[in-house]
């Protein structure tokens, strides 16, 4: 089974990226708030895609860039955004099916296999 992350930003600036698989996937969503040493607050949403019949497991980590990078942002604001972001990711997952998770700009995707 091949799971790959296709970034369309070069072909379609502001377009979507997609996590696609040749067979259906089971996906789980998780989010966490990260406070950097410089005081920047960042919300990171993690999508884990697991094949139902293969051992190939990949994690796509997406970080919403710029949303919590201002001095006015704080942990409380980030906490209030978590349910909204998770709901959006859930809707995107359901709309596109378990085999394709679409991530709208400005989500910045990275994919890496788990050991």
List PLM regions with ranges.
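N-terminal intrinsically disordered, cationic/polar leader segments
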Residues: 1-115
